[in-house]
A protein has these predicted regions:
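Short, well-structured N-terminal submotif of metal-dependent ribonuclease cores
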Residues: 1-35, 49-64, 107, 116-117, ...
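Acidic active-site catalytic centers that drive phospho-/nucleotidyl reactions
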Residues: 5, 42, 97, 115
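Generic structural signal for small/hydrophobic residues in well-ordered secondary structure
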Residues: 6-7, 43, 84, 104
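Active-site neighborhoods of divalent-metal-dependent phosphate/nucleic-acid chemistry enzymes
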Residues: 53-59, 67-114
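Short, structured coil segments at secondary-structure junctions
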Residues: 69, 121-122
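Active-site regions of enzymes building and remodeling cell-envelope glycoconjugates
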Residues: 123-128
């Protein structure tokens, strides 16, 4: 399994060419693709704030984007929420990024992200 940061999920599901060659190859070869439920919330917030436009309403987009047989929706478990809050101060402070990173660590899977701050924090557990 690989875990997708929200922007990677949006680009992959939307067929946007922003993905790196490595990210695209990892997505094509993955047997399972994890999407955290917090990414659904983040996407809805970005749409509401006008920072992201979708070709349909956000609920329909999420349902369609989670419909791929390889995609697994991952809930925010209490242990992961606690881990995200306890991560050291060097990790970027964005709560969504912290939750995504804690989820990847808990599942021992790579986090696919373009976010340089996350990649600098832990180059071994992230990929782009």
């Amino acid at each position: 399994m690989i875990l997708l940061d929200t922007h990677v999920w949006l680009w992959w599901a939307g067929g946007v060419p922003e993905l790196s060659a490595r990210a695209r190859a990892e997505l094509e070869g993955a047997d399972r693709i994890g999407v955290c439920s917090i990414s659904c919330w983040e996407l809805a917030m970005l749409v509401r704030l006008g920072r992201v436009e979708l070709d349909r309403d956000v609920r329909s987009w999420v349902a369609l984007a989670l419909g791929d047989d390889r995609v697994e929706s991952l809930p925010l478990e209490p242990e992961i929420a606690a881990e995200a809050g306890a991560l050291d101060h060097d990790l970027p402070g964005d709560p969504v990024d912290r939750i995504l990173y804690a989820t990847a660590r808990a599942l021992d899977v790579p986090l696919v992200t373009k976010d340089r701050r996350l990649r600098r924090y832990d180059a071994k557990s992230t990929l782009w």
